[in-house]
Design a protein with these regions (language model features):
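Mobile, glycine- and charge-enriched loop segments
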Residues: 1-15, 85-105, 226-229
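An N-terminally biased module of ancient metal coordination in phosphate/nucleic-acid-related enzymes
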Residues: 1-80
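Conserved, mostly hydrophobic/aromatic
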Residues: 9, 26, 34, 88, ...
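Active-site beta-loop-alpha junctions enriched in small/polar residues
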Residues: 9-13, 39-41, 104-108, 132-136, ...
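Short, acidic/polar
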Residues: 15-26, 109-121, 215
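N-terminal cationic-hydrophobic initiation segments that often serve targeting/anchoring roles
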Residues: 26, 92-96, 122, 190-191, ...
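Active-site gating/metal-coordination segments in enzymes
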Residues: 56-171, 175, 234
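Catalytic pocket-lining loop regions of alpha/beta-barrel enzymes
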Residues: 127-128, 138-259
Length: 265
């Protein structure tokens, strides 16, 4: 049996990289199979006046950043990063031996939208659902009915769920803005949906300012629930720094740890 190199976490963002460039980079890196993630994000959330005021108030309270400039940066990030389910499915269809596609749904939108996106992911034959509480502006415990719908779908259709855990660029580097991506928020779902593999992207650790921010919370969840998996995309220090390596070995082992690059972001 030939061991294959799998990159579990790749963003084929069309505004950043073309299909041709992505294929070339995957080949150059010696990757046999890449898992491509859709990203259902946009700035509509910030167009609601009340939401916008709340956001700016929090920005002033928690941070000394220039909040209006920060708002523009966030809008730019969201508009740039949008990657549709259809686009990812097209790349997979064009390169079936090289790519596996994972869809995305924004749970901060209404229930009928969530149901529509689940149908779309099913029809496109995608391997699972990617959720990103930071860029999608949702609290996993406050959107319980929508998240349960997504988990029930994945349970029934035998699909995976990938959840971003840790901070994110710009304002989301401030932990106060990234609390929704703390792995501790997912205990309810890990316990209720034991047959759904839940992958904690970045192992709770992604943060330039506070590396390893919720590493312990991620391990805690993984120790308790065998359906919790991890990827180490964008957090290579978890594989090289002794204190992290030892703790992973001791507390959860390596069988549920997946390699990912987060390329090209």
């Amino acid at each position: 049996l030939t061991l294959r190199v799998v990159d579990f976490h790749v963003h084929p963002i069309p505004r950043i990289i073309s299909e041709k460039e992505l294929l070339r980079e995957v080949e150059l890196a010696g990757v046999d199979v890449a898992v491509l993630l859709a990203l259902d994000v946009d700035s509509y959330h910030l167009e609601d006046k009340r939401t916008l005021i709340k956001f700016l108030e929090e920005c002033i309270e928690y941070s000394n950043l220039n909040c209006l400039s920060c708002l523009e940066t966030i809008k730019h990030i969201l508009q740039t990063c949008y990657t549709s389910n259809e686009y990812v499915a097209k790349l997979v269809k064009n390169n079936p031996n090289k790519f596996i596609g994972v869809g995305s749904i924004n749970p901060s939108k209404n229930m009928s939208y969530v149901k529509e996106k689940l149908k779309e992911i099913d029809k496109l034959g995608m391997a699972g659902v990617k959720l990103i509480p930071t860029l999608q502006f949702f609290n996993p415990l406050k959107e319980k009915s929508k998240l349960e719908k997504i988990f029930e779908f994945c349970e029934e259709k035998q699909k995976i769920i990938i959840l971003h855990t840790g901070c994110d660029p710009s304002i989301w580097e401030e932990p106060a803005f990234s609390q929704n991506a703390n792995p501790a928020m997912l205990k309810y779902y890990a316990s209720k949906f034991k047959r759904v593999p839940i992958i904690l992207a970045h192992m709770g650790s992604y943060s330039r300012r506070y590396p390893g921010i919720w590493f312990d919370e991620a391990l805690e969840l993984g120790k308790k629930y065998s359906n919790i998996w991890f990827d180490v995309s964008a957090v290579p220090y978890l594989l090289t720094e002794e204190r992290y390596v030892e703790k992973i070995s001791r507390e959860v082992g390596w069988d549920r740890v997946l390699f990912g690059s987060d390329y090209p972001v």
